[in-house]
């Protein structure tokens, strides 16, 4: 690994935009720009694979948030998870996010 690079990890990102007229597109684009690959099978949540740290991802997203919005970025791992998703969704997560 070169200096400044970070090993790619999986993160779950969840946000609530609480002001009327919020620009979801800017928040969504900032999340996508932080990711090597991503999926969003939920409202206001993304599972991404990124070579950025949680702090660096947050730094890309927070300029698009208001003070009453909420954001959490949590590192996810491939050894302890569960959910109710379709087979194709699980396949994508296993191969692209955790793979």
Language-model-derived ranges and their functions:
Residues 1-6:
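Short, Lys/Arg-enriched N-terminal segments with co-localized hydrophobic residues
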Residues 19, 40, 48, 83-87:
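Generic structural "secondary-structure junction" signal
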Residues 67-99:
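C-terminal structural segments of small proteins and small subunits
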Residues 9-40:
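N-terminal first-folded block
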Residues 9, 30, 34, 58, ...:
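Functionally constrained cores in energy, signaling, and assembly domains
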Residues 37-78:
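Short, intrinsically disordered low-complexity segments
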Residues 23, 27, 53, 57-61, ...:
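Amphipathic alpha-helical interface surfaces
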């Amino acid at each position: 690994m070169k200096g400044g690079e970070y090993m790619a990890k999986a993160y779950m990102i969840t946000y609530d935009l609480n002001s009327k007229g919020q620009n979801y597109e800017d928040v969504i684009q900032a999340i996508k720009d932080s990711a090597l690959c991503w999926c969003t099978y939920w409202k206001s949540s993304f599972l991404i694979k990124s070579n950025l740290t949680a702090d660096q991802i947050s730094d890309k997203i927070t300029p698009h948030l208001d003070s009453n919005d909420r954001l959490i970025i949590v590192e996810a791992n491939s050894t302890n998870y569960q959910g109710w998703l379709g087979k194709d969704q699980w396949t994508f997560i296993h191969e692209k996010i955790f793979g």
